[in-house]
């Protein structure tokens, strides 16, 4: 159930964003300069489209991917597919072989069991990074959500060598009780 007292929920409704998550990307982009006008952005786990909407409004061309349907957005091409399957990567590459930014706010179905939810979030983040390694341009940027837990440092260490700048970040728009953090990787290098 949506928290009807949630400031960002109401702000998103008032300002026409598809979800409160739009403010997370806006805040991260303001801090880290992830998306520039003219960039080609790949949004994995995109539905309902808050991040795709922000990227398009920033002047990027966006390819959005999700297992669930998404209502159309201007300057956004949608692919319905599972990011863990190779055929989805093929569809992504049919549109473009390389992208300036790969981002993922994908979240697993929450079971209520912390360890399971954490591990599922790491699996989704790894699937996102697996795609990013294939399509992200050298010098490109990568953002992915993970839930904090015992595997987070191992995951960070896996990504670390691929980026000149890397850190975990929790935007102000994240709920205070949320265990989500975002890995920010800038200036990608293929190794």
Swiss-Prot record:
Its EC number is 2.1.1.166. Gene3D superfamilies: Vaccinia Virus protein VP39. S-adenosyl-L-methionine binds at residues 49, 51, 66, 82, 105. InterPro entries: RNA_methyltr_RlmE (IPR050082), RNA_MeTrfase_FtsJ_dom (IPR002877), rRNA-MeTfrase_E (IPR015507), SAM-dependent_MTases_sf (IPR029063). It catalyses: uridine(2552) in 23S rRNA + S-adenosyl-L-methionine = 2'-O-methyluridine(2552) in 23S rRNA + S-adenosyl-L-homocysteine + H(+). Its main location: cytoplasm. It is found in: Cytoplasm. The keyword Lipid biosynthesis does not apply. Pfam families: FtsJ. Keywords: Cytoplasm, Methyltransferase, rRNA processing, S-adenosyl-L-methionine, Transferase. GO terms for molecular function: rRNA (uridine-2'-O-)-methyltransferase activity. GO terms for cellular component: cytoplasm. The active site is at 145 (proton acceptor). Specifically methylates the uridine in position 2552 of 23S rRNA at the 2'-O position of the ribose in the fully assembled 50S ribosomal subunit. Belongs to the class I-like SAM-binding methyltransferase superfamily. RNA methyltransferase RlmE family. This is Ribosomal RNA large subunit methyltransferase E. The gene is rlmE.
